Amino acid sequence: MRIVIQKVSQAMVKVDNEIVSQIAKGYMLLVGISTEDTIADAQKLSNKVLNLRLFETGDQFWKHSIQDVQGEILSVSQFTLMARTKKGNKPDFHKAQKGEHAQELYNQFLDLLKTTLGADKVKDGQFGAMMSCSLTNEGPVTIILDSTE
């Protein structure tokens, strides 16, 4: 499982030019699920997302987690994070988990976040849809998490 986590002051997802989710201060997550991922990977990375200290107090950086600041999370499934580009110029997506299985694990990941942060604090896009994402990245702070590391 791979996640790109971005600290944001606001983020929004649209499908067919309609807003489906939006948040204020918090994280925008892009979540890729591989064919090898299990619930253990979802547990590991949900714990990391919830406890990673990316927020500051005054001039003291890296002091507070998303829980500490009562921030929100906007999560978007993104199979393209599993792309391999070693050969040629066309991305290879064979390592990306297929539809139904990916959606099941993705939903379990969201449930883990909601259990700790609260269902009202965790939003997501529309699984499998073509989405338009917009955000204001603060810092900018962008970190890549990988359950194999």
From Swiss-Prot:
It comes from the Eukaryota. One of its GO terms (molecular function) is D-tyrosyl-tRNA(Tyr) deacylase activity. GO terms for biological process: D-leucine catabolic process; D-tyrosine catabolic process. A motif (Gly-cisPro motif, important for rejection of L-amino acids) lies at residues 139-140. Homodimer. NCBIfam families: D-aminoacyl-tRNA deacylase. This is D-aminoacyl-tRNA deacylase. It comes from Candida glabrata (strain ATCC 2001 / BCRC 20586 / JCM 3761 / NBRC 0622 / NRRL Y-65 / CBS 138) (Yeast).
